[in-house]
Amino acid sequence: ESLNSYEKSYFLSKVKVEEQLLVNDININLGSGGRYFPLDDYVTKISRHYKYIILETEIENTPWTNWCNNLSDKFLFLLNPTEGIQNNQIIDVMDQIQEETPEHLLVDKELIVCHENKDHFPIKTSEYMAALQPISNHYHINVNDKNDFSRLARIITNKSIGVAFGGGGARGLAHVGAYKALLDNGIPIDVVCGTSAGSMMAGIIASGFSIDKIKS
């Protein structure tokens, strides 16, 4: 839903494919060869009308999962931090695809850590990234916050909004007003950084403090 706000997108899961192609188990149709021409034709037709196709793999390393992996130009790992990384088999397959791909055609691998809430500071992120290396980027989202999904959608569609705050000692307090002006005009901030006093403001914003909290 959030992705469709920025670019026409289509979500495709194994269940949806089986419903559309009237098959009981697409894994059987794909078989060990990993090809099923009605599926290829179906996805080709979809791609004519949508900018992005989101493919949902299975947790196991199945023919459907392999088909998705071979077709994808970006891997998005959704991780529940309370469970950690459990699908090592799929990761191994993706690593093999990367090894067999010319460097200039390598697929981006990005980690999305899905929190029930973000009241607590994230932990073990570096461990997750090390297990999935090479990772081009990682994001923390609150699955109950639509704004976080909108931020992720902007990032995926290359429409993210970044702000860099400059230094200036006490004058850096003016950044609070600049931040409030952005919010008042409905301009979200997806990426934030700064130098000197600006870095302090960037850290406060990245921590999710409201304007009222900042002022107090």
For the regions a language model picked out, list residue spans one by one.
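C-terminal helix of von Willebrand factor
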Residues: F121, P134-N158
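Walker A/P-loop phosphate-binding motif and the immediately C-terminal alpha-helix
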Residues: E1-D25, I46, L152, A197-G198
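Flexible beta-alpha connector loops of hexameric P-loop NTPases
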Residues: D25-R35, E83
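Short internal beta-strands
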Residues: L12, E110-C114, V191-C193
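A short, charged/proline- and glycine-enriched loop
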Residues: V107-D108, I156-I161
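Structural motif
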Residues: Y52, K74, S160-G162, V191
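Conserved catalytic-core segment of NTP-binding enzymes
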Residues: Y36, Y42-V43, R48-N137
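Patatin-like phospholipase
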Residues: G162-A164, G169-S216
